[in-house]
Amino acid sequence: MSELKIKAAKAAIAYIEDDMVIGVGTGSTVNFFIKELAAIKHKIEACVASSKATEALLRAEGIPVIDLNSVQDLPIYVDGADEVNERGEMIKGGGGALTREKIVANVATQFICIVDESKVVKRLGEFPVAVEVIPMARSFVARQIVKLGGDPEYREGFVTDNGNIILDVFNLNFSTPMALEDSLNVIPGVVENGVFAKRLADKVLVASASGVNNLK
């Protein structure tokens, strides 16, 4: 599996141009991308990190990291997904960085999703949806999610970079992913959720034994 993730990471490097500021996601596949990026760090201007973990990895490779607030234009954002379909809709947030990932993805002009073939699905929903919640609202939000048909589970011992908690939600109805994304976000106490149906991936680079294909 690592070999496929490395393939996908290498394929994304082809989209990096000189003097770019690059948005960098979070997760195991992205970690391989950071390793590849280190080889051309002299060509890029800097990176914007979607998590403290990613920032630490970038700095460890000697890659400059800048704050998103200092960036007006972000040409490209590279990140993985827990699930992705052929339309570029995704479930993200297995690593708990979904809120910052969604922010950086929305700033970026182009979102390149890098995955191995096991992450490609016809219909989203097998993987649970991470919902970032303000701690005091945890029980209330969980009850509201149950009303939507979901089965929320508190992610024990995990605190997001924003100081919040995560509810992992199973069995949600993905017949209309965009409506689901909205219905979760309007619950008071919800910061963000891991359904990416409004900000789609522009390119989905899928690695398999035979090579890397662009799903979109």
Curated annotation (Swiss-Prot):
InterPro entries attached to this UniProt entry: NagB/RpiA_transferase-like (IPR037171), Ribose5P_isomerase_typA_subgr (IPR020672), Ribose5P_isomerase_type_A (IPR004788)
Pathway(s) of this molecule: Carbohydrate degradation; pentose phosphate pathway; D-ribose 5-phosphate from D-ribulose 5-phosphate (non-oxidative stage): step 1/1
Cellular component, GO annotation: cytosol
Active site: 101
Keyword Hydrolase: no
Enzyme Commission identifier(s): 5.3.1.6
Binding residues for substrate: 26-29, 79-82, 92-95, 119
CDD domains named in the record: RPI_A
BP term (GO), one: D-ribose metabolic process
Keyword terms, alphabetized: Isomerase
Keyword Cytoplasm: no
Molecular function, one GO term: ribose-5-phosphate isomerase activity
Catalytic activity annotation: aldehydo-D-ribose 5-phosphate = D-ribulose 5-phosphate
Xref: Pfam families: Rib_5-P_isom_A (PF06026)
Listed NCBIfam families: PRK00702.1, rpiA
Function description: Catalyzes the reversible conversion of ribose-5-phosphate to ribulose 5-phosphate.
Protein family (similarity comment): Belongs to the ribose 5-phosphate isomerase family.
Name this polypeptide is given: Ribose-5-phosphate isomerase A
Gene: rpiA
